[in-house]
A protein has these predicted regions:
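Nucleotidyltransferase catalytic core that binds NTPs
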Residues: 2-161
């Protein structure tokens, strides 16, 4: 039985691509990530979700300031940067996307985070939990490229280095 109208709107053939990050503050490395996200998505929808964490040491920008900064630094991706006060982590994102009717999802992250997110996102697929519920037909975690924290330039850039 179908309980919600959104269940009629299943996007079975489309894969929604997304990324999730602190981007606090945004860097050239984040710009590379957004470019790779858009390229991997092609004609499929893609979305950028930012964490809401804030503290004086590692996360100086508020959520709203971070949204403004990322949109200003990367204007060609501005429309894909989502504002969602309900999204606190990657599982919240998947629950949201599942609720929007998507059944295939691909997360694009730095190479150092692929295994972590593959394990985490698949662990909760099909399970009701604090984040809500999602049951995707396919969950992929794709590397945006190598990230070497010791490297110079784009490959080594992170907000923590600033």
């Amino acid at each position: 039985m179908i309980n919600k109208f959104s269940q009629f709107l299943v996007e079975e053939e489309k894969v929604v691509y997304f990324t999730f990050g602190r981007m606090n503050p945004p860097t050239i490395g984040h710009g590379k990530l957004l470019d790779v996200l858009a390229a991997k998505a092609g004609r499929n929808p893609h979305k950028v979700f930012l964490s809401q964490s804030q503290d004086s040491k590692k996360n100086p920008l508020s959520y709203s300031d971070k949204i403004k900064s990322v949109r200003k630094m990367f204007p060609k991706h501005a429309r894909n940067i989502m504002i969602s006060k309900n999204v606190k982590n990657a599982m919240d994102i998947l629950s949201t996307l599942y609720g929007q009717g998507f059944r295939k999802v691909a997360m694009v992250v730095g190479s150092d985070r692929v295994i972590e997110f593959e394990t985490l996102l698949n662990k909760y697929n099909g399970k009701e939990a604090r984040h809500g519920f999602y049951n995707f037909m396919d969950i992929k975690v794709i590397s945006a490229g190598e990230r070497d924290p010791d490297a110079e330039g784009v490959e080594g850039m992170s907000a923590s280095k600033q």
